[in-house]
Structures are given as structure tokens and as C-alpha cells.
């Protein structure tokens, strides 16, 4: 499909720069294809679910993966920014470098505070390989837990570009840009639909008889990359590492066997569950990379509902929700959201989407 079909006008003031307080007081737009939109709030979510349903959360934890450093070559020094997006070994990460053209294979980069003599104040790396679109493989002088500690010391939370262009990252973001259930370190970006959940809301969901299950997809910086192709068939998704345990797969399959629904919290959970599901709809264990790219025409295998934030024009995530609930339905839903003051993007409001083909089946 043509990428420009997924374009729409989004006023700058619609982009949220801070999350709602409390988290679960963000607005929630309920979208059921063929029915009127419902304006709700996230704390009402238990009222929209049924006992026996299951919520699927992504428990990845955001690391401070934005590094600022200096590259020295032949006496010339230039500033380099790196956004780590995939760990490939104890001492190496794939990263997006800016400006990528200034960096060559073999270059040495020193990240952090150049005046410090302590390894926690600086972090050195070698550019081992260069790829496309500013991507490079960095091999660090530290590895394992020592590398993790150094990244935590010198790194910054990599706020999405549309927020970072408006304000600097601050200490508050280290809490705001993390779900309350995050536990598996490795993400560059938060699974933002999960940011709306509070411990109190999770308890109310359990009390309703709704199951909670966790998967892990380490969200990479590729989620921020714009779609530069004119047609969706020419866009290549960056892969991300994910895990679905045997126990979780069995539990979710049992939900369907009992007639319950699987509700993914966030597009990351959905992409992982759909990667792990076969054409028969059975979810199987998963451990590895996925680069699944969901656009209209995709036949969903396992996920019944999706809770997700409001996404940017021409983004792969708006393409995904258009595939899930219908192209025309989602354009209308976003028009409703914009005209009614919903807040967009990572710190914005949420939507609860029903699958278009499920809506037809139950109409």
C-alpha cells in the first residue's frame, strides 16, 4: 500500500510531553468497528473486560541507551551520538550513530565524561562494522555486568524524537518512561501502552477475574525510524529480540480454549504474540528475533483486542492499528481523537481496539 495513505494532520499541541497523573487517569478511546466510539478513562478498563480474559504485558525494562561521546581521528575530534538498539554479545551492541557519515570502521569513540579517570565516568568503544542508515556495531572495552553498569552511569533515557525535540530528558523521565512491572533490562523504548497501569489498577483487574501474563520484547530504536519508502512493501523493519515462555504460551492457549479473549497491552506484545502464533492460532514458545511488519491485509492469528497509544502519521504503528481495526475505522478514530483533545504518542492517551474481523463475526 502507498505510505501516504496513512498520513493525517496532527497538530503539534496534540503531542504529550508529560504523562497523565495519576497514570491510569489518561483517556481511553474504545474502538469497536461498526459502533460509535466511546470516550473513557484507563481506570475504567476492568469494566470493559470479562472474567476469563487475559491481558498480555511486555515486561521489558528501558535502559539509558542514549550515549554522547567524542571520536578522535588524526588529531581531529568530532562529537558522536549513539542510540543502542540491540545487544549481540557481552561486549557489543548494534547502535544508530549520528552523524553516521563521520564515523568509519575502526574508529574509537569515548562516551561519557572525558575528564574522568574512572571507568564508570567514561566508556570506550570501537566501531567494528558499519551498516545502512547510520547503523553500526560497537564493541566496548567492558563486557557483561561491568558494561551494564557503565551504560547506566553515562547513558541517558532515549526519549522519542518528537518529545526530545521539545525538551531535554530529565530525572523524572527515568520513572515516567518505565512501566511499573518492568523487570527484564534491554529496551531502548518503553512499551508505552503499559505506562498507564498502576499497582491499584492491576489489582482491580485481577479482582475482576482477568488473567495477567508477561512476555518480553526488547523494543529497539528502530521503532523511532520514519518510513522513507513510498510503498509499504519496500519498508524493512529492524528486528527486535523477544521471549514467550512455554508456560505463558500454554496459559494463553487455554484462555482461547475456554472462550476468553487475549488482550495485548501495546503493539510490542501484539507483534511478539503474532510472531509466536502459527496459522492454526496456537501460540508456541518463542526466543529470538522478530521483524514482523503488520499492514492492512494481514490475517491476525491470536490477538483479540489491543490496547495502544495514539501513533504518528505514516508510522508503522498506525499501519498496524489500521490492519487490526480497519483502515477507515482508524482514520475516523484518529480524527475523533484529535478533534476531542486526546493526547498523542508515548506519554499520551490510549485506545482499546477490537479486531475488525471479530466485529464482523459478532455483528
Curated annotation (Swiss-Prot):
GO biological process: queuosine biosynthetic process; tRNA wobble guanine modification
Enzymatic reactions: 7-aminomethyl-7-carbaguanosine(34) in tRNA + S-adenosyl-L-methionine = epoxyqueuosine(34) in tRNA + adenine + L-methionine + 2 H(+)
Subcellular location: Cytoplasm
Cystines in this chain: none
Pathway given in the UniProt record: tRNA modification; tRNA-queuosine biosynthesis
Enzyme category, top tier: transferase
Keywords recorded for this protein, A-Z: Cytoplasm, Queuosine biosynthesis, S-adenosyl-L-methionine, Transferase
A Gene Ontology term for the protein's cellular component: cytoplasm
EC number: 2.4.99.17
Coiled-coil residue windows: none
GO molecular function annotation: S-adenosylmethionine:tRNA ribosyltransferase-isomerase activity
NCBIfam families: PRK00147.1, queA
Subunit structure: Monomer.
Described purpose of this protein according to its UniProt entry: Transfers and isomerizes the ribose moiety from AdoMet to the 7-aminomethyl group of 7-deazaguanine (preQ1-tRNA) to give epoxyqueuosine (oQ-tRNA).
PANTHER family the UniProt entry points to: S-ADENOSYLMETHIONINE:TRNA RIBOSYLTRANSFERASE-ISOMERASE (PTHR30307:SF0)
Family (UniProt): Belongs to the QueA family.
HAMAP family from the UniProt entry: QueA
Protein name: S-adenosylmethionine:tRNA ribosyltransferase-isomerase
Organism of this sequence: Brucella anthropi (strain ATCC 49188 / DSM 6882 / CCUG 24695 / JCM 21032 / LMG 3331 / NBRC 15819 / NCTC 12168 / Alc 37)
Encoding gene per record: queA
